[in-house]
């Protein structure tokens, strides 16, 4: 079986059985089945996590870690491919099936290299298959399990397939690559009365939760424009719910969104600013509020020294000019040990045809991540596997 056939089998098998969050029994069983014949120690250091440790056999005391996320999304697949999801309402729409396939193929490479070419793998290797990247940050539970200390892991690498880059493009940068994120929920409390009773009532005595929410959203947008002039900062609120009927003042309003920044200083400034404009909006309408800032994910911040160490082995690596305002829980690993995260392009090159194979899978991604038609061809994963090989052969 060629490496492409191996990658295709893993990816399509896993694409058929998407599971969510920490509830991953079929996915875990599949990964354990692939790892079972390999000369590795398989452990479960925390709930719904699978780790595979390979002793390089050269007396190494340190290990290189490779991370793959396992969870899918609550999306009903609409691709029509022969290997589509068999779990209604669930889909691998973020490429985690590809991430797992690359890691599994890398594990078989390590096993073969240790057996057939002793000494070529100079460091021990730890593969980490983690749950809940899309939800609560499963990486954090892995870090807290002590698995890195147990196996002497002192560096970690990971990938994300990326439709915005041409297929096969390898991209990253030293320092911040992806943003810090924080879900923000606001509950505004007013008083619901019939609108007929509001005539002549001053705005500051209206207790109108919908009006307070509207004032907040306008002011918050102006705040972000000011903060964003200093460095990248986004605070967007995509959820607004208020009131129950059309002819009564809204007694309650719920506003929810996400804050994205790259530095702790800007995170603090943005949170303070949001609280200030919310204070002003509620004071102006006679309302009160409850505000919840989730801590969210830290920024993905690639270790500069490790980046400089690996860059000579990755001559095709494109350096990202500006960090991206998306978030990834790989960031938690980088709080525990040096790490580098890569983006792997899956998009169609400009002017390139996009044929489909016999199973209906296009050669290049045609849709964005988190959409019900997101697909890519496994040939792209060969690039990721090749990068993993080069990283694992480094001292």
Describe every region a protein language model picked out:
Residues 15-17, 92, 96-99, 160, ...:
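Histidine-centered active-site/metal-ligand motif
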Residues 53, 73, 81-91, 98, ...:
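Histidine/acidic-residue-rich, glycine-tolerant segments that coordinate divalent metal ions
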Residues 55, 69-71, 130, 187-191, ...:
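Solvent-exposed residues in well-ordered beta-strands and their adjoining turns
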Residues 195-196, 200-203, 210-395:
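Metal-dependent amide/peptide-bond hydrolase catalytic core
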């Amino acid at each position: 079986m060629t490496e492409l056939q191996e990658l295709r089998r893993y990816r399509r098998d896993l694409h058929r059985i998407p599971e969510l969050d920490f509830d991953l029994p079929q996915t875990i069983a599949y990964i354990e089945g692939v790892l079972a014949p390999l000369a590795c120690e398989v452990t479960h250091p925390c709930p719904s996590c699978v780790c595979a440790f390979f002793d390089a056999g050269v007396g190494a005391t340190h290990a290189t870690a490779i991370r793959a996320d396992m969870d899918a999304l609550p999306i009903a697949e609409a691709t029509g491919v022969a290997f589509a999801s068999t779990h209604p309402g669930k889909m691998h729409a973020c490429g985690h099936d590809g991430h797992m396939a690359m890691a599994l193929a890398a594990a078989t490479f390590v096993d073969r290299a240790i057996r057939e070419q002793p000494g070529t793998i100079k460091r021990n290797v730890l593969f980490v298959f983690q749950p809940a990247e899309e939800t609560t940050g499963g990486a954090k539970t892995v870090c807290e399990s002590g698995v890195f200390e147990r196996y002497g892991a002192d560096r970690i690498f990971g990938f994300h397939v990326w439709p915005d880059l041409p297929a096969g493009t390898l991209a990253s940068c030293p320092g911040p690559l992806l943003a810090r994120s924080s879900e923000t929920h606001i509950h505004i409390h007013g008083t619901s009365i019939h609108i007929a009773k509001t005539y002549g009532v001053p705005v500051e005595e209206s207790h109108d939760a919908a009006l307070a929410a509207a004032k907040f959203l306008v002011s918050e947008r102006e705040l972000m424009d000011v903060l964003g002039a200093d460095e990248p900062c986004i605070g967007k609120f995509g959820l607004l719910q208020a009131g129950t009927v059309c002819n009564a003042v809204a007694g309650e309003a719920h506003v929810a969104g996400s804050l994205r920044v790259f530095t702790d200083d800007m995170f603090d400034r943005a949170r303070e600013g949001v609280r200030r404009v919310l204070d002003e909006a509620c004071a102006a309408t006679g309302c009160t509020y409850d505000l919840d800032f989730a801590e969210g994910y830290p920024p993905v911040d690639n270790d500069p020294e490790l980046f400089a160490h690996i860059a000579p082995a990755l001559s095709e690596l494109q350096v990202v000019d500006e960090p991206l305002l998306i978030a990834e829980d790989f960031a938690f690993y980088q709080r525990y040990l040096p790490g580098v995260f890569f983006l792997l392009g899956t998009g169609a090159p400009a002017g390139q045809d996009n044929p489909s194979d016999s199973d209906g899978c296009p050669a290049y991604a045609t849709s964005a991540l988190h959409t019900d038609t997101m697909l890519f061809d496994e040939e792209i994963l060969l690039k990721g596997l090749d990068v993993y090989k080069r990283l694992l052969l480094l001292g």
